[in-house]
Amino acid sequence: MFGWEFPPHIAGGLGTASYGLTRGLAKHGIEVIFVVPKAYGDEDQRFVRVVNASEIETPFGDTREQDVWEKLTFIHIDSNMVPYVAPEEFDSYAEEYRRTGRTILDKEGWTERYSFSGKYGANLMEEVARYAMVAAQVARDLAGQFDLIHAHDWLTYYAGIAAKRVSGKPLVVHMHATEFDRSGEHVNPQVYEIERAGMTEADRVIAVSNLRRNLVIEKYGI
């Protein structure tokens, strides 16, 4: 299960609803693994196993989910970005790579971690895309430990899609609120496309009410 927040660290109703759902599933004997961008260690894990996406090691420069990466915009900085190395030392370091014909970044075998804020700040779209990269790795790491993928609201839909593509497991997306609920008719087109992509690729879509269901059918053609 992919969420964006989990009690006690919540900013709205999404985390509370996710917690209630995990408790309900646990009462029916369903084991839930709940992935969040940032866990703090004080989450109630009596009913759920919480996975902190900020602690997941992912292959450096992994392009297996290239279509998600393409939604990010990168700005090149023409600078010797190697930490803790003086300019003279860097030149010597780089010359060795040029002499041997290797690229300065030999990425094979490297791993990295993404540090998520888990909030709703200025870098939200970037975090949503990076969360999908981590979700793909989570699906690989937990292969054989889950039967179903459940993604809560648009923030996690790319993550759900990535996990489905890696694992082949069915995807359920949970529509708590649409972009039309949040913004009226003046929707954010990026959010709308993420919502539509998530529902299109899902095997099942859960709407929290008949009103929401009708809105999904009317506005998204699902």
PLM segments and residue spans:
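A short, glycine/small-residue-rich beta-strand->loop->alpha-helix junction that serves as a flexible
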Residues: 5-17, 42-43
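Short amphipathic alpha-helix
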Residues: 15-26
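A conserved catalytic-core segment of Leloir-type glycosyltransferases
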Residues: 33-139
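Nucleotide-sugar donor phosphate/pyrophosphate-binding loop at the beta->alpha transition
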Residues: 128-134, 170-172, 180-197
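Active-site proximal beta-strand in glycosyltransferases
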Residues: 148-150, 157, 161-182, 195, ...
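A short, active-site helix/loop in glycosyltransferases that binds the activated sugar's phosphate group
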Residues: 200-222
